[in-house]
Structure formats: C-alpha cells, structure tokens
From Swiss-Prot:
The active site is at 204 (nucleophile), 230 (proton donor). Monomer. The record marks 292 as: Transition state stabilizer. The keyword Hydrolase applies. Its EC number is 3.2.1.1. This is Alpha-amylase. Its cofactor is Ca(2+). It comes from Streptomyces hygroscopicus. Ca(2+) binds at residues 122, 175, 208. SMART domains: Aamy, Aamy_C.
Length: 478
C-alpha cells in the first residue's frame, strides 16, 4: 500500500470570491416520474443478464430505471443494428424470448428498478427473421401489407423537407404509414408490452414519425406509461425536438455534444451554460453518449477514460434533465454486435457513477448554487444545502477554497466511497482543499459519518465558525 497526500474539500468562500464565476440556478426537472430519476441503459444485454444487473447493481445503487434494447424479432446478422430492423412484433430477438423478458421485468421490479423498452415502430426490414421465417419488403404476414406503408418508396434525402423526413425511408427500410388507424392500432398493440410490466418506452427514430401520429398511437393506449423519444436536433432541419415534448420526454443530443466540447477544449467552465439553447429542463433526457454517438464521434465515449467519467459525474450532479447512464461494450468494429460475456464497459456499475446516482437521489430538486470556476479545467458547485461537487479536468492537482453550503458535519466522498463510506470522509470546517488531477469530489446529506473510514478533511460552511479539525488528509490507496 502506498500513502500520498490528497485533500478533498474546500474552505473560506471569501478567499475565492474574486475568481469565482456565478450563474443563476438551474431549475430542476421532475421526470421520469418518481424520486429516482436516473436511468441506466444496458445496451445489447441479454435479458437474463439485465435481471441480474438490476438485482446486484442497479437496485442497490438507487437507479430508478433500466433501458433495454429492442425485444422484437429482427433480421439475422452479426451487427448490433440488426436489433433495430424488425420483421415482426414477436418477442423473439437475440436478447431473449417472451419468458426471459417477463422474468427480467419481475426481477428488476423486485429490485426497485423500473423498465424502459426500446421500441422500433417507424419501419420494418426485409430478410430472414431470427426463427428463419422469410420476410419481404412491404409484406409482413399477421402485421402489415403493402398498403400500410407510405407511398414514398425511396431513401430520405432532404432533411429540410418534413414530408421527406417522415414519409420516405430511413436507410431503405419500409416506412410505416403511421397516419393509418390500422397502423396506429397495431403499433399500440405491440406497445402492449405494458402487460408484461414494462413501465415505459424509448421510441426509436421518433423524428421520422410525425408528432401527430405518435400522439395518436399513445392515445390508443389505456395506460401508455413513461415515454422518451429519439429526436435528433439538426440546424436548419424541418423537424425539431420541441415538437414532441407534448408526448413525452425527448433525448437531448446537444447535451452530449456540449459535454465533449467542454471536456476536450480545456474549458469545462463553459458548462455553466449547458442548459442554454436546449429543451426545457423538465422535458430533456440527458446522456454523455449512446450507441450511435459513441460510434459517430459526436460525443465522449468510454475510450476517453477519465474525461468520460468526469462528464458522467457532472451530468449526475447538475439539475438539468433526466440523466441516462450508458453502458455498452468495448469495440473496434463499429458494426459488430456484443461478443459474449466479456468486454462490457459496465459504466453504470462503476463506483464513481453509482456514488453519483445516490447523490442525485439525495439532492432531489435542490437548486444549483455557489457555482465556481476559473475559466479553465476545474469547476465546483453546490445543490443548495443538499450536496456539493468539485471536478478537476486538468493534469495537475487543484488547490482551492470553495463554498459548500452544506450543514456542518462529516460526509462521505461518494465518488470514492459509493457504499458504506469505506473510502474517504470530509469534515465541513476550516482548511484549504485539493482535488487531484482528472478526479472529482462529491458530498451530500444522505452520506454522512465515519463508518469504516480512515481520514477526515475540512471544508468551510459560509456563515459558520471555523472550528473543525485540520488534517493532512493522507489516504491509503487500496
């Protein structure tokens, strides 16, 4: 074991007043419903493995939701995107059958985690299904025939033309005529996965279905549950994300792009305006990356290491949007499906992330206050008197003083001690602070005490006397 100095907190607010940047607090959002608003997306995980993850990891960490990849029967192939090319609405994809899906939902519910199913309802594909039945384009026995598809039988070519985007074909896939009552009823029937206990849906490619048609589908469901829709913003495009906010939440792709710009530019101070120009906070689902963006280069990915982790810490600490933590698998071939039982990134289960899920649950709707930055790589802020976080995206340790707004007491640093406070504690009091390079510190009122902890270091609470112990804060590295 090696010992090294590491101070975790901050002190006298007046010392940093001249350098501090302030910003009006962001209001907090309230969706998805319930007190636990964080989703974990387990991309391409078999349903039996999702069930285990809910029981062993997601439930204990405090996740409110798990999002799973599409369940419907799809074309054969060794590429991940075959899951997004359905040939029927049978629960018969590579991730598990109907029984496996139902068992997963039950296990996740028992662990306190609700289930969001990724639903592909914009189009159908052609080819052999998972059970070797052959499907031809525009002919899906028991579901759809030629007349149930849009008449534009060509690929989308003009995103400034609404009709082209919503009636022509996404990568040559047969585009469902969602203006038809029959099609709407059939889609609503598939979304009857609610009968298996599913709590909500991510609507894939929602941008390519008119908001009017999607609202009509939802209106056919007695209890549609929570919806989040994939509507990617594009400058100058005809279809906008805000058209869909009356139906449900919308994935805010600009958020992940903003995070990448901030963490790679050397100026994470720009994140004080992360909500500007985006969807209203109560309607946006935020994420650092997903399976598309990690492959097209528009966001950070697991390959970015510490910056990726810090971006997730920031997302979970800040009040804008409903956060979605993505867990995929390691890849070199952008098209390749998951290889088996190894290679999963498991970001949703990492200590830094699970600790911040608890932070998010503890601070609730508390406002963002006491924003501090120096115009460069570090930042810090409080969530009223409920929580405090500091991030250092630099390559050298940061020594600084911060205003935490926390009540006096001893707190667990939850990014280093996500459970049972078995890493570091921080005592709110009076000493200077250091945050290591490429690291963060997070404290909240739901994680206090010194159970199994080795160290204490002080931070200052504005307006309180500085009488807490001083410490060199040496931490044993495990």
């Amino acid at each position: 074991m090696q010992q090294r100095s590491r101070v975790l907190g901050g002190t006298l607010a007046g010392i940093v007043a001249a350098a501090a940047a302030t910003v009006a607090p962001w209001p907090s959002q309230a969706t998805p419903p319930g007190q636990k608003t964080v989703t974990a997306t387990l991309f391409e995980r078999k349903y039996v493995d999702v069930a285990k993850a809910c029981t062993d990891q997601l439930g204990p960490a405090g996740y409110g939701y798990v999002e799973v990849s599409p369940a419907s029967e799809h074309i054969q192939g060794g590429q991940w995107w075959t899951s997004y090319q359905p040939v029927s609405y049978k629960i018969a994809g590579r991730l598990g059958d109907r029984d496996a899906f139902a068992s997963m939902v039950s296990a996740c519910h028992a662990a306190g985690v609700k289930v969001i199913a990724d639903a592909v309802v914009n189009h159908m594909a052609a080819g052999s299904g998972r059970h070797h039945a052959q499907y031809t384009k525009y002919n899906y026995p028991g579901f759809y025939q030629d007349q149930t598809f849009h008449g534009c039988r060509k690929s989308i070519s003009d995103y400034t033309n609404r009709d082209d985007v919503q009636t022509c074909e996404l990568v040559d896939l047969a585009d469902l005529g969602t203006g038809s009552d029959y099609v709407r009823t059939t889609i609503a029937g598939y979304l009857g996965l609610r009968s298996l206990g599913v709590d909500g849906f991510r609507i894939d490619a929602a941008k390519h279905i008119s908001a009017t048609d999607l609202a009509a589908v939802k209106g056919k469901m007695k209890d549609p549950g929570f919806w989040v829709q994939e509507v990617i913003y594009g400058a100058g495009e005809a279809v906008r994300p805000d058209e869909y906010t009356g139906i449900g939440d919308v994935d805010e792709f600009r958020y992940g792009t903003h995070l990448k710009s901030a963490f790679q530019s050397g100026n994470i101070a720009q994140l004080k305006s992360v909500a500007d120009g985006k969807l209203w906070q109560r309607q946006a689902r935020t994420f650092v990356d997903n399976w598309d963006t990690e492959r097209n280069g528009s966001t950070l990915t697991y390959k970015d290491g510490a910056a990726y982790t810090l971006a997730n810490v920031f997302m979970l600490a800040s009040p804008y949007g409903s956060p979605n933590v993505y867990s995929g698998y390691e890849w070199t071939d952008k098209d390749a499906a998951a290889g088996g039982s190894t290679g999963w990134t498991d970001d949703a289960a990492k200590r830094e992330i699970t600790g911040m899920v608890g932070f998010r649950n503890a601070v609730g709707s508390a406002e963002l206050t006491n924003w501090w930055d120096n115009g460069g790589r570090p930042l810090a802020f409080a969530r009223s008197d409920k929580g405090f976080v500091a991030l250092n995206n630099g390559d050298a340790a940061l020594t600084q003083t911060f205003a935490t707004s926390l009540p006096a007491g001893t707190y667990c640093d939850v990014v280093h001690a996500a459970s049972s406070c078995d890493g570091d504690t921080v005592t709110v009091g009076d000493t200077e602070a250091q945050v290591d390079a490429a690291k963060s510190v997070a404290l909240h009122v739901g994680a206090t005490g010194q159970s199994a902890c080795r160290q204490a270091v002080a931070l200052h609470v504005p307006g309180q006397s500085a009488g807490s112990p001083r410490s060199s804060a040496k931490r044993v590295e495990q």
